[in-house]
Amino acid sequence: KKSAKYCSLVGIVVSSIGAMIYYAASFVCSTEISILLSMVSTIYVTGAFHEDGFADVCDGLGGGWTKEKILLIMKDSRLGTYGVSGLVLILAIKFSALREIHPYLIPLTIISGHSVSRFIATTLIYTHPYVRDTADSKAKPAAKSISIGMLSINAFFGLLPLFFFKTPLILLVILPPYFAK
């Protein structure tokens, strides 16, 4: 229940592995191969946890018309056409976005992306009501137990990597969760 405060710190640890893989590979491989190896390493380290969740969301939103049907599809362990399509597209977008960044900034961008995204996810859990009403839910206890103190610790680790960029405009990434409610 108290692990939410370390969500962004976990993002820093996982992404540091990916950033180190990118950095080491960049000495012997092209930027493209280095990015792909970094992506593979973070997917492997997390057990494809986030990709599985994203595929479930794509399947649910693509195949369901009501809240109940969407949630039922998302709970189904099978991978559907919308999930596969979503995974291919999101990984292609991630690769393409990293490819557009100066190679020097890619490791910092990887670390920032992982920490900020986990901070945003935790913020949304804190600010929004839980969707599922059933008692057998896995995430509802975590969603109810996040305090402002836990969110503050998470914010510290989530936003820390942004301060290593040379422009204060990078801090604009924290605005979407603020306006999401």
What are these regions (language model features)?
Residues 1-47, 63-68, 76-77, 82-181:
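Hydrophobic alpha-helical transmembrane segments
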Residues 49-53:
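Juxtamembrane transmembrane-helix boundary signature
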Residues 59:
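Carboxylate-dense, calcium-coordinating segments in secreted/extracellular and ER-lumen proteins
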